[in-house]
Every structure is written in C-alpha cells, then in structure tokens.
Regions:
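Extracytosolic ligand-binding ectodomains
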Residues: 2-8, 13, 20-387
Length: 387
C-alpha cells in the first residue's frame, strides 16, 4: 500500500511541474502557487496529505491555469530559506505553507512572497503571512457567544501550564470575557487532581455531606428518611462558585481534566462544560468520566464529506488539518479570479465573509477569524448546537 502512495505522490509532483512548464512556454497568464510542505522528515506524512488535498482542490476547480510548485520545507530553517529563495527566483509569489509557525521570523525577510500558513498558533496580523489555522481567538469568540446565549454568569477558564500559557492568556484577554476566573493547571495528574479539588471546594463539600448525613441519621421523620436516602447516592453537598467551565486542552490532557472534574463531583447537569476545538476526535466519544460537553469547530458535514472523498481516492484517513489546504487553494483562486492579480497579502483582506469547507471566515488586516459552530458531545455522538 505504501508503494502505491509513493507512486501517486511521485506522479503528482511530476504532473504539477510538467504542466507548469508546458503552460509557461506558451506565455499564458497562469496562477502560480507554491507549496512549502514537509515532504521529508517526521512530518512527511502531513506534507503528503496536504499535497493530496491540493490536488483534490485543483480537480474540483478544474481550471488548467492554476499551477502548483511543491517544495520541501523539511524540518530545518535552512531548507525553508533555500526553498523561499527558489520561489523568489521563479517569480512564485503566493505560497501555501508552512504548516507551523516555528520559522516565521525567517519568512519576514521574504517581503516579495505571500505565505498562507496552516498554523493556528496566532491570529495576530503579519505583513506577509496569513494564518488559516483554527486559531484560539476564533474558538474563544464562539465560546463567549455560546456562554452568553446560555445566560451563564460565572465562568472558570482552565488551561495547562506549558510553553503556550502566555499565548492562551493573551487571547483570553483579547476576547474580553466578563465575570471570568483564569486557572492554570499542572500536566501532572496527581497535582492536577489536587488543584481541581481546591477549585471546586471538594473537601468542604464532602464535609457538608457527612455533616448532613450524621444529622439525619436516627431520625424517624419520613422526609428526613427520604433526604437521607438521596444523600447516600451523592458524593458531596453544596454548590461551587461557578456555573460554566471552559477547558483549553485536548487529547490526554483534556481527558485528565474531565476525569478530575468528575472525581470532584462536578456534573454536566449542573455546570456547562466547554472545551476548545477537538476536530471531532473519535477517541473522546469513548470518554466515560463526563459524557456531555460542548466545543467549537468547523462545519461537521463538510468535514465528513471531505474525509470521505479523500478516503475514496487515497484509501486512508488524512490528518484533520488537511482540509485547510483544500480551502487555501480555493481562497487563492477566488482572490486571483476577482482581483486578476495578487501583489500582496492586502489582496486577501475582504470586507465580506468567505465560505469554505471549514465554514465561514473573514480576513481583515491580514488576520483570519473563523465563524465556528458549537457542537455537543452527547451519548457518543457529535451534535450541532442550534444557535
């Protein structure tokens, strides 16, 4: 199977470049798009996924005047710099990539190039870089709107202590939540549980329960007996000082937080629980600690259709962010078709919403804000919330 994929990839690379040269010799006006993707190294699989997605977009647009110039970004800045120099020499101004923001400083030196990156690490505008990733600011804006709709008044925002802590806090401030408490936690599960116990006043609520049980024990009053039987089904007694929780985490980190919340007797029936974008990760469908929670994300129907089409052609499921590469091709083509020429990143700053596979988004001052939907994880299914 791997041999088949290698043949397909090699064919795409040859096809891209063969048709480019053929059209250039005719002197036709073509849309030249560079693709700066990791085609070697640890992220090689992601780079190949992106290239296949670009090919799908070309097929759907069906305009022979669009030509792709793939170059390997590898994993070292020297390789990226070399590729960018080649793009400049070949007069290729619009580049899909890179996939992350690690070497953005180096890209700033190539002012003649426009980079449409798949990174989501920042939504701050850059002179020659537009980041199309599902950024945290877009997620928080959708979450804020949802919290307001649900009429929640006291929110706790939880996020891990790591290299992205300052980035998270900066975005939270920019969205301007009201009546919100910020709470950073340790990735160590033992420390995390103690932190959540403190946040939820777990020990005091446990004491409240035991005290009430002792008070009712021995009473022969029917109402006391009924209350006692109900209390014996509980783990704590008393309310917490918040009505909603936002967890900026994913994967095992998110699962650890959900487990700690369940352990401290925080129920989704009483507290609105929201997480960051989960990309419809199937593994969270098996989550048993807290079964119902909400998260912002892209259009689920389009996401499923894209993955199904990708699987139908390439016989495997792509990385979740692959759909962004497809949308980027469509975006570049839309701008080129309407503007006739793309000279700088400013050409992408449109006053109207743009609709892609991921859903609607807007670009202004080189900044991308996605209009994300809210989904609920309920009984092992992803359900779109009606706003």
């Amino acid at each position: 199977m791997k041999k088949i994929f290698k043949i397909i990839l090699s064919y795409l690379l040859i096809t891209f470049n063969t048709f480019v040269f053929a059209v250039e010799n005719k002197g036709e006006n073509i849309l030249k798009i560079g693709a700066l993707l990791p085609l070697t190294g640890e992220l090689k699989g992601l780079g190949e996924d992106m290239l296949y997605a670009i090919n799908l977009a070309l097929h759907d647009i069906d305009n022979p005047k669009i030509k792709i110039y793939p170059k390997d970004s590898g994993s070292k800045k020297e390789k990226i710099i070399e590729a960018c120099k080649e793009f400049s020499k070949e007069d290729i101004k619009i580049i899909i990539g890179p996939t992350d923001s690690e070497f953005f400083k180096e890209l700033h030196n190539f002012e003649d190039l426009i980079f449409i990156s798949l990174s989501n690490i920042n939504s701050d505008p850059k002179k020659n870089i537009i980041m199309m990733g599902i950024n945290l600011e877009s997620q928080l804006l959708a979450i804020k709107k949802f919290i307001q709709k649900e009429k929640k008044k006291k929110t706790v925002i939880l996020y891990p202590k790591n290299e992205y802590t300052k980035h998270v806090e900066k975005n939270i401030r920019s969205v301007n939540f009201t009546n919100t408490k910020l709470f950073s936690y340790s990735k160590d599960s033992k420390i995390l549980t103690k932190q959540i116990e403190k946040l939820t006043s777990y020990k005091q609520r446990k004491i409240n329960l035991n005290s009430r049980v002792k008070k009712l024990e021995g009473s022969e009053e029917p109402k006391d007996i009924r209350e006692l039987n109900q209390l014996k089904q509980r783990y704590t007694l008393g309310k917490v000082n918040f009505d909603s929780v936002v967890i900026i985490d994913f994967g095992n980190g998110l699962k650890s937080v959900l487990t700690s919340l369940a352990y401290t007797d925080i129920s989704e029936k009483d507290i609105l629980i929201i997480t960051g974008n989960q990309w419809f990760d199937d593994s969270i469908l098996k989550e048993t600690s807290i079964k119902n929670f909400y998260f912002p994300s892209i259009d689920l129907k389009n996401f499923k259709k894209f993955n199904e089409k990708f699987y139908e052609i390439y016989n495997y499921k792509p990385n979740e962010i692959t759909i962004l590469a497809y949308d980027i091709v469509g975006l570049i083509y839309y701008i080129w078709k309407n503007e006739k020429n793309i000279n700088s990143a400013n050409n992408f700053n449109l006053k109207t919403d743009i609709k892609g596979k991921v859903g609607k988004f807007k670009i202004f001052d080189n900044k991308v804000i996605q209009k994300l939907n809210i989904y609920k994880l309920e009984e092992g299914k992803f359900i779109k919330n009606k706003l």
